[in-house]
């Protein structure tokens, strides 16, 4: 995998941005951003464990389905192959999806389109879990793809126009 220090530096940068945007929200309970954020634990020693909310705790079907498919169907693979830092990247990916567009317009997300193009998935598919499953299975374990995805995520999060629906 990637050098852990490089990976954590990238993740910390994204994490700090996510915290900043969360603090700017007036009505966080209206979106699933907070549900996504509390799966990420951070302390002075760095990233520790990931708390995974149950589907019932997630106030959005899109987000809940993504949790189910990443941490449910792929839990065995994650437990055996992923370090905490890698799981944080997955968490930040979900947060990035929620930050960048209205959930109803998810199909227009650059990252989702990128993943679908990468795996040649039907653009009109409603099988959200397949997208995230492919992310875990095929993209996360390729160093070049992971770096590319981190860069895309950082670009999306920093794009003020794409976050305008939150205001």
Explain the meaning of each model-derived region.
Residues 1-167:
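Active-site hotspot residues in diverse enzymes, especially metal/ion-binding acidic/histidine motifs
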């Amino acid at each position: 995998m990637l050098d852990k220090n490089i990976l954590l530096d990238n993740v910390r940068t994204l994490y700090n941005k996510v915290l900043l945007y969360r603090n700017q929200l007036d009505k966080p309970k209206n979106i699933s951003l907070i549900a996504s954020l509390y799966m990420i634990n951070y302390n002075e020693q760095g990233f520790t464990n990931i708390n995974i909310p149950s589907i019932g705790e997630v106030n959005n079907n899109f987000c809940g389905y993504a949790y189910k498919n990443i941490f449910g169907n792929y839990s065995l693979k994650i437990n055996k192959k992923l370090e905490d830092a890698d799981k944080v990247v997955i968490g930040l990916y979900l947060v990035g999806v929620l930050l960048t567009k209205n959930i109803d317009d998810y199909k227009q997300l650059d990252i989702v389109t990128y993943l679908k193009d990468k795996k040649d998935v039907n653009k009109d598919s409603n099988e959200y879990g397949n997208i995230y499953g492919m992310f875990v299975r095929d993209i996360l374990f390729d160093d070049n793809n992971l770096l590319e995805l981190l860069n895309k995520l950082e670009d999306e999060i920093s794009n003020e126009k794409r976050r305008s629906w939150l205001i």
